[in-house]
């Protein structure tokens, strides 16, 4: 029996079929169903052309109509509906120069990357498996559909996808597929870096990331990646033995940087075209690590480290130092903090200006606020304005 996500999407297939077209669930959603994993995105393949799909459904978004894909909105969800197709020649290492729509499911499945993704399922749960993908799933084997070198030449990202699937699913990559990955590996350098970043993020999240890293080393894939092209491949070798799944690319960059501090954080961010969000989280993780190295876990560390980064920090310490930190320890310390943020401090810039009316504004205000903030957080000074004022007046700041 098919699961709830497929039942929700079934009316789309029913509409296609009742109007004389074919319609199937395809790809990763079918694979994940067989593996009893959570279903995220459901993709649909059909014999209907994009124009015919748009005619059948009221809410559609023609996101990739030139390649046969439209998004159908149904039940508050978005579903990619793609016309059966054959791909033309690939010259940009990503997309075919042209596509030819076909009416045969077999032709559509034949163009897909791996056998475990070349699966289709109808609304009754009947699976179409032309390339023994179910057998490969049982064997935990990653194998290309058809000629491996052709598949990787069409889109070199498939090389990284194969390694990513080994990390996520614990699969072994079939020998012929491995050989083709090695032969075509240099084409990875032609890929858009944003696509590489997405694959690496997913790869490092996998439960079998150590296995994936070994593939990267053995196939010399690291030498094709930004920054690593300059001979920094020892980073992967250094991280392999103690790696654990890393849940964000910020954690990945933090590990890379701490294993080789000669490469600046800015260079990682720039070369992998990361967002400011990733940049800020990376910097906070690295700063927290360095503080931890000097002071251990204390009030100030938990004050400056956002709760959302705790788990990433714990993973970082484990990978770099082989030290296990319990989240409960962080929770217990945080529960005793006198303040959670600076706005709770019983001192502000106006207080300091009032207490030192003859001093011009300057850096001394910021420095003094930070010093008092640290003393209060570390419980060396009560968060009481009267006592804080006495301390400030007894420790007059440098006016410069």
Swiss-Prot record:
Entry-linked SUPFAM superfamilies: Nucleotidyltransferase, Poly A polymerase C-terminal region-like
Organism this protein belongs to: Oceanobacillus iheyensis (strain DSM 14371 / CIP 107618 / JCM 11309 / KCTC 3954 / HTE831)
Residues reported to bind CTP: 28, 31, 112, 155, 158, 161, 164
TM regions (residue ranges): none
EC number(s) per entry: 2.7.7.72
Subunit structure: Homodimer.
Top EC class for this record: transferase
Other noteworthy facts: A single active site specifically recognizes both ATP and CTP and is responsible for their addition.
Family: Belongs to the tRNA nucleotidyltransferase/poly(A) polymerase family. Bacterial CCA-adding enzyme type 3 subfamily.
The protein's name in its UniProt record: CCA-adding enzyme
Cofactor(s) this protein cannot do without: Mg(2+)
Catalysed conversion reaction: a tRNA precursor + 2 CTP + ATP = a tRNA with a 3' CCA end + 3 diphosphate; a tRNA with a 3' CCA end + 2 CTP + ATP = a tRNA with a 3' CCACCA end + 3 diphosphate
NCBIfam families per the UniProt record, alphabetical: PRK13299.1 (NF009814)
Residues that, per the record, bind Mg(2+): 41, 43
KW S-adenosyl-L-methionine (keyword) present: no
Any one biological process term the GO annotation gives: RNA repair
Highest taxon in the source lineage: Bacteria
Stated role: Catalyzes the addition and repair of the essential 3'-terminal CCA sequence in tRNAs without using a nucleic acid template. Adds these three nucleotides in the order of C, C, and A to the tRNA nucleotide-73, using CTP and ATP as substrates and producing inorganic pyrophosphate. tRNA 3'-terminal CCA addition is required both for tRNA processing and repair. Also involved in tRNA surveillance by mediating tandem CCA addition to generate a CCACCA at the 3' terminus of unstable tRNAs. While stable tRNAs receive only 3'-terminal CCA, unstable tRNAs are marked with CCACCA and rapidly degraded.
Keywords (A to Z) from UniProt: ATP-binding, Magnesium, Metal-binding, Nucleotide-binding, Nucleotidyltransferase, RNA repair, RNA-binding, Transferase, tRNA processing
